[in-house]
Regions:
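Mg2+/Mn2+-dependent nuclease catalytic core
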Residues: 114-166
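Metal-dependent nuclease catalytic cores that hydrolyze phosphodiester bonds in DNA/RNA
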Residues: 1-130
């Protein structure tokens, strides 16, 4: 895996507007891809999440959500530092778990990454939307936008359709 700074990615500041994530890119405040996708969720998906929250209770649902967010952030930090050739030593429980999960991605996914154009890249379509992705480059011979996802268990294909749209 080699670096090729083929593109200059814009800098951006993330901000909340009406409690929705937006990116300040140049002179534009653009809604995030995640914000747009959450606004287009099916009623079925929203109801499934609401049903799960009722089943486990609001306190447990919030705990699961926060743990997943913390774990995902730690995983992304570890992978970002790895890709940049920097080390990250986080001896907290979350950090140790993130390192374990990151090593799976490093061993099984990153060997097929041939070229890196950017890490933590802001991408946008002027006037419409913006987002940040973990990597841009050549993966398995194809130009690729790569976004790492954290999960404690395998996901069924029908549950991750938004990942592909993202």
């Amino acid at each position: 895996m080699k670096w090729n700074k083929k593109y200059k990615y814009p800098k951006s500041i993330r901000e909340l507007i009406n409690n929705k994530r937006h990116y300040d890119v140049g002179e534009e405040k653009l809604p995030s891809v995640t914000t747009i996708l959450s606004g287009t969720e099916s009623d079925e998906k929203r109801e499934a999440i609401a049903k799960w929250k009722r089943r486990v209770g609001s306190v447990e649902a919030e705990s699961v959500k926060n743990k997943a967010a913390t774990s995902g952030t730690a995983l992304h930090s570890y992978l970002e530092k790895y890709i940049l050739g920097e080390g990250l030593l986080d001896l907290t429980d979350e950090g140790v778990e993130a390192e374990r999960m990151a090593k799976v991605i490093i061993e099984k996914g990153l060997p097929d990454l041939e070229e890196i154009w950017g890490s933590e890249c802001v991408l946008h379509y002027p006037g419409l939307y913006a987002g940040a992705t973990d990597l841009c480059g050549i993966y398995q011979g194809r130009e690729s936008i790569i976004d790492f996802k954290q999960s404690n268990k395998p996901k069924r294909e029908e549950y991750i359709g938004d990942y592909y749209l993202q």
